[in-house]
């Protein structure tokens, strides 16, 4: 009992004790003693049970028990302790101990256990007494066990089946324990029936154990799949498919990853479960109901899961369309808003001359052209808005029922929902919806199965607002153009003014026109470069862009003369009139124009090169895809293998030609790669020089990679199909040739039926011909088997070909976006089915012909015997009847008895023949099934248990190799993807940022807030600069009074420098700065020492001055203040201090930047799940690079070890082949080939093996019995054939002599020799088993030591890098893997223990074989006794003849005839029995041929002559080591894959703009905090210095006269004022930092706004026009007075409730959107303005938001 005070149910046991007072100390001691006694009882129970189990094992082995007295004494001691425990527990309960009830309950359970233990003790040790005098009614016990077993059923759920397995294991052990007792009951005749019943019981128990094991395994795997499917379905039902979910891209990636990688494997597992269930049902498994229920559940859940996959795909498409539409509309609105702001700001006519207005008019013309083109975009968005699905309704119940459409079929409790049908949504409950069908029936179904069809009111409103915005912009552009034209006409009529100014303005206008033209062309170039190519027409789009670039080139050629003329005129004007007012501006414009033109030429050249390269790349990609599509579509047309041989040849030639064509066209891939590299180079040049990134590069790289994969897949597809065709052709030719030959032979077989007119010679001729024909038919059986093997090969080849075709079709459907149920077309019938039918028909025909001819042979033999016996019968009738002695009558009676026995046996054989024929017809109707051809070979084979273990290890090893291969392929793919991402990161780091800016739009409110924060941050920066200038000025003034600079900041800097080890270049620069800093510090220290010396001297002089007169003091002070050297010294120190401060600020900035990078890296490493990453281009950590290099070296080493392990495995396999080839070479090869190629279910194999062994045993027993019976019959016949002797003899003495049969004696001797030999073999096997177990235990210990050492090494290695959190997590995972490996080793140990149990079971089987031999010996003894009895009867007959001395014995003719007839009947019955036995054997062979017609042939060696364990055991150990090598390499590959996946996920999600903004704000916040800390430190330092200066000033003020006091007072006042300003500045900084932190927190938290909003606006109807006016407009129009205006304004409101979920939980505020104020509900509750009852009324919607807002705001 581990703990006495664990929680239990309260018991009712409470013994009566005397109540007495007891202290707390005594109570605690009582509880302690009670705990000790209970532990002692628990220990006694455990010890007693262990010793009783050991004694029970000894009793079962027939030995005496050892621990009878010890166990009895411990039981008595436990009972005594229980009495004490009950009394102590009663006392504790009486004293109201808190755990008194639990203590009493535990003691009650202990008492029950001790009572059960005593009963078990009596039961066990009573067996020892019964062994001496056995009185058990074994027959009743066996009957009881058999009845109990027959009444057992199979559970319907997994826990019940597990319980049944445990119960039956106990039951089976009990059944096995009965066997030795039955074997000890002697050789009584009545015991044979009991043994037969026991064997039946044992067989039934073993069968139930196997059935339970198979059912448990099948139900466990079905339960695992059902749990996975349930979790997947629940995840999809609970997923948010509404507009609120913005994480749909990751869901799309997850969905595509599962579809491409895991769906096929999962479907194979589901299909495997169905096939295994069908096999169990076909084998008539007794747990049929449970298997069918689990099969139906898996099928239903898998069907539901496929339907949910269809729904998920549809929802992802709707979400993408929804969000893409909103992003496009937002972009369009931003563009139109920008155009509108440009029209307002840029195109105003005020303060512009004629030339500027002329330039603006030209720009407006271009703007109108752009707007005309943009009209198509707006109309397209309006059309798309009509197709957008209203996702918002998925998260809220609409005001009225709306129609929904079903995406899949779903069977609910209320009814069936059909795909494509429309229903009405009544209520939205989140995960499930309440619906109503067309008939008015209410249904409840998951929301994921439905979609709300278009249109979306919000999308329509957005599209309409976009259209109205577009029209307003067009109108404003037209109005601006009219205004500018009017202003232009006015300016044309005005006086031009000064000629030089007019000329300058003209030149400026010309340059502005050229510049605007250049800007327009640059925009056109960037407009060509920035948008990605259209997916469907990339080649045409790139060609059109090339044409556009040519047009831009022509435009530049047109602009060049004008640019040259304008710049030349401008330069001439500048030289002619350098003093003019427009000359500086004109010079700047000329330089800008020339620079812009050169920039534009370079950009145009690179753009043309990039577009040309992209065009070539897209063309090559298109050609390659078209070529692949041609071949793939051609291959996709073939569903199966052609039937005729000629078409097979043509198809093979066609595939060979296609393979050659693919090899010849492989150069296209090289061309594509070259074009891709050229595109990368052009894109990198554009990105580095002009910051123009290529948006198509990532897609093009993916296309090239995908093209290479598709090309390789197509080439492999062609190769595999060609191999399958070649194999199918060869197999089909062999099959067809053999089939036609055998069929022709079977058809042309002659018929030798007996006729009534046939003579004896004709009958003999027919019989001879029939025997020859039957031998010839039997010789053709091998040919039929070969034909079946060829058929199987052909079917397998066709199946492989069809599998490749199905793979290609699935791949093309997935690539083309077709669904499986859409793309399925009519399939041709497989020729394998036809060949299979022909094979079955041929086998049936052969079996039928063989049976018919066998029957004909029997008929001929029977007719021939009748013809031969006919003359004897006639002679017998003509013989005279004479008397015969009594011995002839007795002999006739015996023969008649034998005749009856033979007749009964013949009847049994006929019934068996009929049952076999019925089974043959059943098999014919059912189709061919699996069969096993059994060959008996006398050879040494391994132990079957070890062989099975060896096969299991081989399968495990193959699975591990397959998994490692898959992981290796996945690792290579991830490495390729990682290298591609790293290359993109190195080539163009800003590419993803630009892309995200174009595609990802942050929340509008968040964007506004970020902009506001940016503006405030800029203001803070400007204010910080001003404050820093003030601080520097203050430092200059106070520097003269500073005594020593605080070293704390330097120490902090040094500490941070130690940590900055990420960038070697920065580290080197920082080391250089540190050295310079140290030199400056040394110089500063020297100067400070000089300053301190001068200050000490100054103090000393001041003290001396204090002792002198006032005038002298004044003069001395003036001299000290005006000392030029000191002033120079102070100014030098001030300058040095400023330099030091500047350097410190620079180093602080560097430190801050490095810290920011470190934090960014740490955040990136820590954020594994969160998808918000910062796109920062940083240099990697050198240690991380070295660690990566080490890991790569380790990976290479592990790959080398993996290859070594594979080579070693191959060598082991070759050794295994050599071991299997021992003995007859041909047989070993055939067996090895067949066993490796085909593998059946191990449980079915065990059952077949057991049945084969039983058949062999029965067959051998029957053969031996038949042989002995035949010998006895020969002896009987010999005795009958001996003629009676006439003897005249006088008997003097009667002597009875019994002699043993020599043959029987020899047989007994041989059996005894065999028995001794088997006993020796058993001893050798036991000795070998003990040695093998010792070797296994030793190997397990060695393996465990090796694995523990590996774990320790890995832990030490991983702990060497404590700075990397990701590495540490990887190390923790590796430790978990090693722990799981230890668990696997423990499981392996348990498996070996089970194998030991299996060996013990084999020994028991050997014991049963010995019993069978003993029974055979007893049967031989019985036959010997019978033979002796027959001899005795013969002797008695002779003695009887002897007593009648002179009587002449003659045969009675009548008796002689009867005797002859009986003998003929006996021989005839024997002959018929032999014929029936032959026919039965023939039918059995036919049955075996029919059973093997469908599946592969297996050659099973069933006779184990000598069990050898050593080589196989070593082989198992070697395979275990190789398996561990494979597992270790798999774990290492898993670690590498997980690391690469983590890094890949970091690179993929590294481009989030919102995360970048937040991190930027965090960095700014951190900088401000650092500045705040620095300012606080500087403030404290300056305050201390000012305090010192103030002290000195007070001293000086006390010592100096009035004229000097004024100067000191003014200086002190200025210092105090500066100190106050600095304190105020610090407080302001603190407030600003807190405000920024609050805003940052508000940006960081996730907002969830409750849809509770009230807005009331009041309008006034104009009485004349009817137009709606606001109160303000009505007041301005004079419709209402001021008081009415104030009253109406007060009635307007715009309240909104906002619920914010932040780090501190959820909080709600009332937002007055009209005034911008926010009122917290929590504060109102705390202050009492709002009561909880009122708030509950609001929550229950009994109070409006307006009333709540009035209460919260306090506006009562």
UniProtKB/Swiss-Prot annotation:
Domain of life the protein comes from = Eukaryota
State if Iron-sulfur is listed as a keyword: no
Q: Please report the name of this protein according to its UniProt entry.
A: Periplakin
What are the Spectrin repeat spans here? 216-317, 323-485, 505-612, 733-861
* Plectin repeat locations: 1651-1685, 1700-1735
What keywords sit in the KW lines?
A: Cell junction, Cell membrane, Coiled coil, Cytoplasm, Cytoskeleton, Keratinization, Membrane, Phosphoprotein, Repeat, SH3 domain
Q: Which residues form the SH3 domain?
A: 399-455
Specify where the region named Interacts with BFSP2 and VIM lies, as residue ranges. Answer: 1557-1756
Give one GO biological process term.
intermediate filament cytoskeleton organization
Q: What is known about its subunit structure?
A: Homodimer or a heterodimer with EVPL. Found in a complex composed of PPL (via C-terminal linker domain), BFSP1 and BFSP2 in the retinal lens. Within the complex interacts (via C-terminal linker domain) with BFSP2. Interacts with VIM. Binds to the PH domain of AKT1. Interacts with FCGR1A. May interact with PPHLN1.
Task: Give the encoding gene's name.
Answer: PPL
Q: Does the keyword Cytoplasm apply?
A: yes
Q: Which residues form a coiled coil?
A: 16-125, 188-389, 585-820, 886-1645
Tissue/organ expression: Expressed in stratified squamous epithelia and in some other epithelia.
**InterPro entries membership:** Desmoplakin_SH3, Plakin, Plakin_repeat_sf, Plectin_repeat, SH3_domain, Spectrin/alpha-actinin, Spectrin_PEPL/EVPL
Function recorded in the entry: Component of the cornified envelope of keratinocytes. May link the cornified envelope to desmosomes and intermediate filaments. May act as a localization signal in PKB/AKT-mediated signaling.
């Amino acid at each position: 009992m581990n703990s006495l005070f664990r929680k239990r149910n309260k018991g009712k046991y409470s013994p009566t004790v005397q109540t007495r007072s007891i202290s707390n100390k005594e109570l605690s001691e009582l509880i302690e003693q009670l705990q000790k006694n209970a532990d002692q009882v628990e220990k006694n129970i455990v010890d007693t049970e262990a010793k009783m189990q050991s004694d029970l094992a000894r009793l079962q082995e027939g030995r005496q028990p050892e621990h009878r007295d010890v166990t009895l004494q411990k039981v008595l001691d436990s009972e005594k302790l229980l009495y004490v425990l009950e009394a102590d527990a009663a006392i504790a309960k009486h004293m109201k101990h808190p755990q008194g009830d639990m203590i009493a309950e535990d003691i009650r359970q202990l008492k029950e256990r001790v009572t059960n233990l005593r009963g078990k003790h009596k039961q066990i040790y009573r067996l020892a007494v019964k062994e001496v005098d056995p009185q058990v009614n074994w027959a009743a016990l066996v009957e009881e066990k058999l009845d109990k077993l027959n009444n057992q059923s199979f559970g319907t759920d997994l826990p019940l089946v597990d319980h049944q397995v445990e119960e039956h294991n106990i039951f089976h052990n009990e059944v096995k324990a009965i066997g030795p007792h039955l074997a000890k009951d002697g050789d009584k005749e009545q015991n044979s029936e009991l043994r037969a019943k026991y064997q039946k019981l044992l067989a039934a128990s073993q069968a139930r154990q196997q059935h339970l094991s198979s059912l448990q395994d099948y139900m466990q795997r079905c339960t695992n799949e059902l749990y996975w499917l349930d979790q997947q379905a629940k995840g999809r039902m609970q997923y948010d498919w509404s507009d609120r979910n913005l994480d749909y891209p990751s869901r799309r990636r997850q969905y595509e990853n599962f579809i491409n990688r895991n769906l096929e494997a999962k479907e194979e597992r589901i299909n495997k479960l169905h096939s295994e269930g069908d096999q169990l049902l076909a084998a008539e498994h007794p747990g049929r109901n449970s298997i069918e229920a689990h099969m139906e559940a898996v099928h239903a859940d898998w069907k539901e899961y496929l339907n949910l996959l269809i729904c998920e795909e549809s929802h992802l498409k709707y979400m993408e369309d929804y969000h893409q539409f909103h992003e496009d509309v937002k972009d369009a609105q931003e563009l139109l808003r920008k155009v509108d702001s440009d029209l307002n700001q840029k195109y105003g006519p005020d303060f512009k001359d004629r030339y500027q207005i002329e330039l603006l008019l030209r720009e407006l013309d271009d703007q109108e052209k752009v707007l005309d083109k943009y009209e198509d975009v707006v109309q397209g968005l309006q059309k798309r808005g009509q197709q957008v699905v209203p996702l918002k309704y998925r998260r809220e119940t609409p005001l009225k029922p709306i129609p929904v459409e079903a995406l899949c079929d779903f069977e609910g409790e209320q009814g069936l929902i059909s795909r494509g049908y429309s229903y009405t949504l009544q209520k939205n409950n989140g995960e499930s919806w309440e619906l109503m069908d067309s008939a008015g029936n209410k249904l409840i179904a998951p929301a994921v199965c439905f979609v709300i069809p278009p249109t979306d009111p919000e999308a329509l409103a957005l599209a309409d607002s976009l259209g109205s915005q577009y029209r307003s912009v067009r109108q404003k552009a037209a109005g601006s153009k009219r205004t500018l034209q009017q202003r232009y006409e006015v300016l044309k009529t005005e006086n031009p003014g000064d000629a030089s100014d007019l000329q300058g303005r003209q030149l400026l206008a010309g340059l502005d026109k050229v510049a605007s033209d250049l800007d327009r062309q640059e925009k056109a170039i960037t407009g060509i470069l920035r948008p990605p190519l259209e997916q469907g027409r990339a080649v045409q789009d790139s060609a059109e862009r090339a044409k556009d670039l040519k047009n831009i080139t022509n435009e530049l050629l047109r602009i060049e003369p004008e640019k040259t003329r304008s710049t030349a005129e401008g330069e001439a004007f500048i030289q002619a009139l350098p003093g003019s007012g427009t000359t500086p501006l004109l010079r700047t414009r000329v330089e800008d124009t020339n620079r812009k033109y050169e920039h534009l030429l370079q950009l145009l050249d690179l753009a043309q090169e990039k577009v040309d390269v992209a065009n070539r790349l897209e063309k090559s990609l298109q050609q390659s895809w078209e070529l692949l599509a041609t071949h793939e579509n051609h291959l996709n047309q073939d569903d199966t293998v052609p039937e005729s041989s000629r078409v097979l040849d043509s198809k093979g030639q066609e595939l060979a030609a296609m393979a050659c064509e693919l090899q010849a066209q492989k150069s296209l891939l090289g061309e594509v790669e070259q074009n891709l590299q050229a595109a990368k180079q052009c894109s990198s040049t554009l990105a580095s020089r002009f910051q123009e990134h290529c948006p198509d590069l990532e897609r093009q790289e993916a296309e090239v990679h995908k093209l290479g994969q598709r090309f390789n897949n197509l080439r492999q597809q062609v190769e595999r199909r060609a191999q399958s065709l070649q194999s199918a052709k060869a197999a089909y030719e062999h099959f067809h040739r053999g089939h036609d030959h055998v069929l022709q032979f079977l058809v042309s077989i002659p018929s030798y039926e007996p006729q009534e007119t046939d003579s004896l010679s004709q009958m003999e001729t027919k019989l001879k011909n029939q025997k020859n024909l039957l031998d010839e038919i039997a010789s053709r059986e091998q040919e039929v088997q070969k034909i079946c093997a060829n058929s199987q090969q052909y079917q397998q080849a066709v199946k492989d070909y069809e599998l490749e075709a199905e793979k290609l079709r699935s791949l093309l459907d997935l690539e083309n976006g077709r669904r499986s149920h859409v793309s399925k077309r009519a399939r041709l019938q497989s020729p394998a089915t036809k060949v299979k039918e022909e094979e079955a028909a041929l086998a049936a025909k052969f079996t039928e012909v063989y049976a018919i001819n066998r029957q004909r042979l029997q008929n001929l033999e029977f007719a021939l015997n009748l013809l031969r016996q006919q003359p004897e019968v006639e002679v017998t009738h003509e013989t005279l009847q004479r008397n015969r002695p009594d011995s002839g009558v007795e002999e006739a009676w015996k023969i008649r008895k034998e005749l009856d026995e033979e007749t009964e046996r013949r009847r049994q054989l006929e019934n068996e023949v009929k049952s076999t024929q019925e089974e043959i017809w059943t098999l014919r109707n059912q189709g061919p099934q699996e069969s096993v051809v059994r060959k008996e070979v006398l050879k040494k084979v391994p132990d079957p248990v070890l062989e099975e273990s060896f096969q299991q290890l081989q399968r495990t090893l193959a699975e591990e190799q397959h998994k490692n291969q898959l992981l290796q392929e996945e690792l290579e793919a991830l490495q390729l993807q990682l290298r591609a991402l790293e290359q993109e990161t190195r080539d163009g780091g800003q590419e993803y940022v630009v892309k995200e800016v174009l595609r990802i739009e942050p929340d509008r409110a968040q964007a506004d807030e970020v902009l506001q924060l940016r503006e405030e941050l800029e203001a803070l920066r400007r204010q910080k600069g001003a404050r820093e200038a003030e601080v520097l000025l203050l430092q200059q003034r106070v520097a003269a009074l500073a005594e020593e600079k605080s070293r704390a900041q330097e120490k902090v800097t040094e500490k941070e420098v130690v940590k900055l080890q990420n960038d070697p270049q920065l580290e080197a620069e920082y080391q250089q700065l540190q050295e310079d800093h140290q030199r400056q510090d040394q110089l500063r220290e020297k100067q400070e020492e000089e300053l301190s010396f001068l200050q000490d001297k100054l103090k000393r002089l001041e003290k001396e001055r204090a002792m002198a007169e006032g005038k002298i003091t004044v003069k001395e002070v003036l001299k000290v203040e005006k000392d030029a050297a000191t002033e120079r010294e102070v100014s030098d120190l001030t300058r040095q201090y400023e330099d030091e401060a500047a350097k410190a600020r620079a180093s602080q900035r560097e430190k801050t930047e490095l810290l920011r990078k470190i934090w960014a890296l740490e955040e990136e490493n820590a954020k594994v799940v969160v998808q918000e990453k910062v796109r920062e281009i940083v240099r990697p950590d050198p240690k991380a690079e070295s660690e990566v290099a080490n890991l790569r070296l380790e990976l290479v080493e592990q790959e080398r070890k993996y290859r070594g392990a594979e080579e070693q495995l191959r060598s082991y396999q070759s050794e295994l082949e050599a071991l299997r080839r021992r003995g007859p070479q041909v047989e070993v090869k055939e067996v090895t080939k067949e066993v490796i190629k085909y593998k059946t279910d191990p449980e079915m194999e065990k059952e077949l093996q057991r049945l084969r062994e039983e058949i062999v045993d029965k067959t051998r027993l029957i053969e031996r019995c038949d042989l002995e019976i035949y010998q006895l019959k020969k002896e009987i016949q010999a005795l009958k054939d001996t003629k009676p002797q006439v003897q005249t003899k006088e008997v003097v003495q009667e002597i009875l002599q019994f002699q043993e049969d020599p043959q029987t004696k020899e047989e007994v001797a041989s059996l005894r020799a065999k028995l001794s030999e088997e006993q020796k073999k058993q001893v050798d096997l036991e000795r070998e088993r003990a040695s093998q177990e010792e070797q296994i235990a030793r190997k397990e210990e060695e393996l465990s030591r090796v694995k523990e050492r590996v774990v320790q090494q890995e832990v030490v290695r991983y702990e060497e890098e404590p700075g990397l959190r990701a590495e540490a997590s990887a190390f923790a995972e590796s430790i978990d893997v090693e722990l799981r490996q230890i668990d696997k080793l423990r499981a392996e140990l348990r498996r070996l223990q089970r194998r030991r149990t299996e060996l013990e079971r084999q020994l028991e089987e050997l014991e049963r074989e010995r019993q069978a031999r003993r029974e055979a010996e007893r049967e031989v003894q019985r036959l010997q006794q019978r033979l002796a009895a027959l001899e005795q009867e013969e002797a008695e007959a002779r003695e009887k003849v002897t007593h009648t001395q002179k009587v002449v014995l003659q045969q009675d003719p009548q008796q002689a005839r009867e005797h002859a007839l009986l003998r003929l009947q006996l021989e005839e019955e024997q002959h018929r029995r032999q014929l029936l036995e032959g026919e039965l054997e023939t039918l059995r062979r036919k049955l075996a041929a029919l059973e093997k017609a469908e599946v592969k042939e297996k050659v099973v060696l069933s006779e184990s002559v000598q069990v050898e364990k050593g080589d196989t055991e070593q082989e198992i150990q070697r395979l275990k080591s190789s398996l561990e090598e494979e597992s270790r390499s798999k774990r290492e590959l898993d670690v590498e894959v997980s690391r690469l996946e983590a890094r890949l996920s970091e690179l993929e999600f590294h481009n989030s703009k919102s995360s970048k903004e937040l991190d930027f704000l965090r960095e700014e916040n951190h900088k401000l905090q650092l500045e705040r800390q620095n300012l606080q430190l500087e403030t404290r330092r300056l305050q201390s210095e000012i305090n010192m200066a103030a002290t000195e000033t007070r001293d000086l003020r006390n010592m100096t006269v009035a004229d000097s006091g004024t100067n000191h007072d003014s200086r002190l006042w200025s210092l105090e004022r500066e100190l106050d300003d600095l304190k105020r500045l610090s407080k302001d900084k603190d407030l600003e930092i807190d405000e920024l932190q609050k805003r940052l927190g508000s940006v960081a938290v996730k907002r969830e706004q409750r849809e509770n909003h009230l807005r009331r606006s009041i309008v006034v109807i104009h009485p004349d026009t009817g137009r709606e006016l606001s109160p303000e407009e009505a007041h301005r129009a004079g419709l209402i007075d001021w008081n009415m205006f104030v009253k109406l304004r007060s009635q307007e409101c715009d309240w909104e409730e906002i619920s914010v979920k932040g780090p501190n939980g959820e909080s709600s505020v009332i937002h007055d959107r009209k005034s911008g104020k926010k009122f917290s509900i929590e504060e109102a509750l705390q202050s009492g303005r709002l009561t909880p009852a009122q708030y509950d009324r609001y929550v229950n919607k009994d109070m409006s938001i307006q009333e709540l807002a009035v209460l919260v705001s306090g506006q009562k």
